[in-house]
């Protein structure tokens, strides 16, 4: 009878590092309410967006203009086609190596260890954000729309623990592969 309590406990313990990293990410990189320390250290030239800021896929900022042209075009077309249902916003696109390195360091501090941090934040040497081949999309309704329709544009959700993270993975109209469990599992 003690067995049913154990899985729930494991689930709670495994959720804690995820919650810490998500709180960090929300506070620093891809969501509203980024930390002021990150704001002081980075600029829009690094792909950094200020606290609570999102951008349109059509904005003229490095987080968008430094995206791979094919990805940028696919995201712009998807946003245009989705606009009757949802206003698709980008919370993070291209990032400088310097910003990506700092995000990983801060996620490691927030989660308590590098292994948990790497489930959500890759290092600059392997990050798709650094190469301009990934975008983080908000709001959740836009993520839901892209999960359903993104393959029409070649856009697929990359990680099951990051519903907001999309990459150009298949040819338009293809079938998206199942998302990897997390960034660590994919790398």
Enumerate the predicted regions with their spans.
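Secretory targeting and sorting signals
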Residues: 6-32
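Cell-envelope/glycan interface and biosynthesis
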Residues: 30-187
């Amino acid at each position: 009878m003690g067995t049913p309590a154990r899985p729930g406990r494991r689930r709670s313990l495994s959720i804690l590092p995820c919650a810490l990293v998500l709180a960090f990410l929300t506070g620093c990189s891809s969501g509203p309410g980024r930390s002021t320390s990150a704001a002081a250290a980075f600029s829009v030239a690094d792909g950094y967006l200020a606290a609570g800021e999102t951008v349109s896929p059509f904005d003229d900022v490095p987080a968008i203009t430094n995206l791979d042209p094919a990805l940028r075009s696919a995201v712009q077309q998807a946003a245009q086609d989705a606009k009757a249902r949802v206003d698709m916003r980008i919370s993070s696109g291209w990032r400088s190596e310097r910003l990506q390195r700092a995000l990983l360091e801060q996620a490691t501090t927030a989660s308590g260890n590098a292994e948990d941090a790497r489930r959500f934040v890759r290092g600059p040497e392997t990050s798709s954000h650094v190469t301009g081949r990934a975008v983080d999309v908000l709001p959740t309704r836009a993520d839901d729309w892209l999960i359903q329709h993104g393959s029409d544009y070649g856009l697929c959700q990359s990680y099951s623990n990051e519903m907001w993270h999309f990459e150009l993975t298949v040819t338009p109209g293809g079938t998206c592969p199942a998302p990897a469990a997390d960034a660590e599992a994919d790398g």
